[in-house]
Amino acid sequence: MDKETAKQRAEELRRTINKYSYEYYTLDEPSVPDAEYDRLMQELIAIEEEHPDLRTPDSPTQRVGGAVLEAFQKVTHGTPMLSLGNAFNADDLRDFDRRVRQSVGDDVAYNVELKIDGLAVSLRYEDGYFVRGATRGDGTTGEDITENLKTIRNIPLKMNRELSIEVRGEAYMPKRSFEALNEERIKNEEEPFANPRNAAAGSLRQLDPKIAAKRNLDIFVYSIAELDEMGVETQSQGLDFLDELGFKTNQERKKCGSIEEVITLIDELQAKRADLPYEIDGIVIKVDSLDQQEELGFTAKSPRWAIAYKFPAEEVVTKLLDIELNVGRTGVITPTAILEPVKVAGTTVSRASLHNEDLIKEKDIRILDKVVVKKAGDIIPEVVNVLVDQRTGEEKEFSMPTECPECGSELVRIEGEVALRCINPECPAQIREGLIHFVSRNAMNIDGLGERVITQLFEENLVRNVADLYKLTKERVIQLERMGEKSTENLISSIQKSKENSLERLLFGLGIRFIGSKAAKTLAMHFESLENLKKASKEELLAVDEIGEKMADAVITYFHKEEMLELLNELQELGVNTLYKGPKKVKAEDSDSYFAGKTIVLTGKLEELSRNEAKAQIEALGGKLTGSVSKNTDLVIAGEAAGSKLTKAQELNIEVWNEEQLMGELKK
């Protein structure tokens, strides 16, 4: 056929196949036999092979990528993908409800959704086309897994409308697909996956999309990052809107008028759990009103308007074979139970934390005891209690050693603490664990430097402190086991790139006691340079918001150690950045901006920058952002499709700006 006829036929085939895919994979209501679908697909493949320039990004033939990737690229999410706070019982839910109503009043409705046990992903669409998909990662930065996500038939390559949005969802492996996959792996003498979630995550992190395509993954989408710009007013309307756009949402959802109705519904949904064709690990409860969501806002880690109810952990009985001791980066000795492998909440468990010596004594835990194990929050395995009546006499009492199992130094118990510690700064285990912490995601975030590689570098005596990482050469690293030319080059490149990190990552990576990632950022933002922080007095540290006495003492102690100062000087000489690179926090009284000290509401869609960027810049100039319009609001900035907030501002005679006025003030 000629080129024009081929073009028209290809367009017709794409429309038809995408329609049939939607009916089959999303609606579960196929209107044609599989053979007819396959015939049309083969016809389209033939046309595109003959005329490659007719192949479009939304073609169903593009779902299975060809090339194997060398590595996943990093992706910064337009809006952070935060985790949810957890509730473990009805009282936790009532506490959540009480906090919500204290902030927004008693007129609250909740949208209740299943918590799918899979992998959280974001899907970026530009003008209606799927252009990028990513894992959640640390919530701010994920990995680009676009080609693998294209293999999931329920993800439309082209939406029903030409929108530029970021959709959030949970990719998962159906139970039937999981069972079939494990049967095949066992047949091929491969290790079976522990649970569907691990299988889904492992499939989406394959560098070869053809492997992901064989795994029969699925997805439920649950939100749009820019939902408040879509002309909808509630979470439940947002899910209906996603249905209209051609996405697959979970239909086991309901709007509830009270928390007691939510609690009753949870019992009903939990009873269905075993019969669902996919795994769930809880229920998500969200305030339905988007205005109320915005008013409630966020903590550093999670939204205040949503909570995840986690199902009670499964408890099983197994045998405690031994107790192993681990030395952490701060010298704490942690006993770990070695168990006869057993399935708990869908995952095979062979180890469980025993926390400390006091807990072992309190529960009278002995080696070879029969113990009850559960997963706390369905994540961390722990020993609940001992079945004393099943003891046979072969059990052995356990006592903590007096010397470090790694270096032989005397162990001490610091006053007021339950943990035993090794206080030898030269302890190999502490140094190794400190290195692992330094390169971790929330610290210096050095790709390719995981526990295995760090252990090799340490054992080969190539690295003894964090400064040594920046002295590594390609010639040294390539000698390590399982390190090829390309992986070595990537590792050296990642190490060099980490030199440019902002100060807060370095501070957290140094492992100063009591200084977590949030405190590290607070200190970096306040003092702006490592030099300023080193000189800070205890009084100056205590004057910083959220820095308490223990934190201040720990910082002073750290920077008074000669060996630490030498290490920091060496890092600076090696080119590691010691300045804060993030936005500066400006007090209202120190700003001459029009925004200083004003209460401001942003509404509608902005063209020149995202809402998060606008918020950050306004706050940097001393403005205070809130989610709802009231008589206390000083200014409303209205973008396109501003909606009810603009109307309310006009009714209350509140000053209203458009985007042009906003940009003018920001550019001053």
Curated annotation (Swiss-Prot):
Where in the numbering of this chain does the BRCT domain appear? 590-668
Q: Which GO terms describe its biological process?
A: DNA repair; DNA replication
Tell me the superkingdom of the source: Bacteria
Q: Where does NAD(+) bind?
A: 34-38, 83-84, 113, 136, 170, 286, 310
Enzyme class (EC, first level): ligase
Q: Which source organism? A: Bacillus subtilis (strain 168)
Q: Which InterPro entries match?
A: BRCT_dom (IPR001357), BRCT_dom_sf (IPR036420), DisA/LigA_HHH (IPR041663), DNA_ligase (IPR001679), DNA_ligase_AS (IPR018239), DNA_ligase_CS (IPR033136), DNAligase_adenylation (IPR013839), DNAligase_N (IPR013840)
Q: Which cofactor does it need?
A: Mg(2+); Mn(2+)
Q: Which residues bind Zn(2+)?
A: 404, 407, 422, 427
Q: What is its EC number?
A: 6.5.1.2
Return the PROSITE patterns for the record: BRCT, DNA_LIGASE_N1, DNA_LIGASE_N2
What is an example of a GO molecular function annotated in this UniProt entry?
DNA ligase (NAD+) activity
Q: Where is the active site?
A: 115 (n6-amp-lysine intermediate)
A Gene Ontology cellular-component term: cytosol
Stated name of the protein: DNA ligase
The record's Gene3D superfamilies line, in alphabetical order, gives:
5' to 3' exonuclease, C-terminal subdomain, 6.20.10.30, BRCT domain, DNA ligase/mRNA capping enzyme, Helix hairpin bin, Nucleic acid-binding proteins
- Show the catalytic activity: NAD(+) + (deoxyribonucleotide)n-3'-hydroxyl + 5'-phospho-(deoxyribonucleotide)m = (deoxyribonucleotide)n+m + AMP + beta-nicotinamide D-nucleotide
> What job does the chain carry out?
DNA ligase that catalyzes the formation of phosphodiester linkages between 5'-phosphoryl and 3'-hydroxyl groups in double-stranded DNA using NAD as a coenzyme and as the energy source for the reaction. It is essential for DNA replication and repair of damaged DNA.
The text of the family note is: Belongs to the NAD-dependent DNA ligase family. LigA subfamily.
Q: Which UniProt keywords apply?
A: DNA damage, DNA repair, DNA replication, Ligase, Magnesium, Manganese, Metal-binding, NAD, Zinc
